[in-house]
Amino acid sequence: MKNIFKLMALFAFVLCFASCDDDEDTVLPTLPVTAANLNGVWQLAEWNGQPLAEGTYCYIKFNRKELTFEMYQKFDSMYARCITGSFKIKNDPYLGYVLSGDYDFGNGEWNHDYIVTDLQESGSMVWTAKDDDSDVSKYVRCDKVPDEIIAEVKVDE
């Protein structure tokens, strides 16, 4: 009889540890990539896992109704620029949501199409270049493009 109680205590002890799984990852639900979910202002927070260099920035303001964007950036030039254009979203059955765009004034297409993942309700998303999976950008939602950046763009125009 003592052996049965010892055996039951051993099983209870083992089951207590078996039910606790620390390796389980919490998966946050993601939103579908639609013009409505992209609508608003997004700031480039990380590029290839690194924060942006001091003095550089990129803000993208998406307009869901017109399917247009305004990009305020100081990235590839010493002057701030506002670049405008239109965007498209395609749901590829193999890649997921692919975002592409065209610049206004005949300036061509974006350099890459981007696979958009991890669009969180909390306000972040990840873009990976479709043809270069080492080009990864993380964007976070913000209320607006800072006034000083808009002023800097107007001075430089």
What are these regions (language model features)?
Residues 82-92, 128-157:
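Edge beta-strand at a domain terminus
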Residues 39-67, 102-110:
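Short, solvent-exposed loop/hinge segments that bridge or flank secondary-structure elements
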Residues 21-24:
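Bacterial signal peptide processing site
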Residues 95-118:
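An anionic, turn-rich surface loop/hairpin at beta-sheet edges
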Residues 15-19:
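C-terminal motif of bacterial Sec signal peptides marking the signal peptidase cleavage site
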Residues 2-10:
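Sec-dependent signal peptide recognition
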Residues 52-98:
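N-terminal glycine/threonine-rich, aromatic-flanked beta-hairpin/loop signature
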Residues 26-43, 157:
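N-terminal helix-cap/turn-to-beta initiation motif at the start of protein domains
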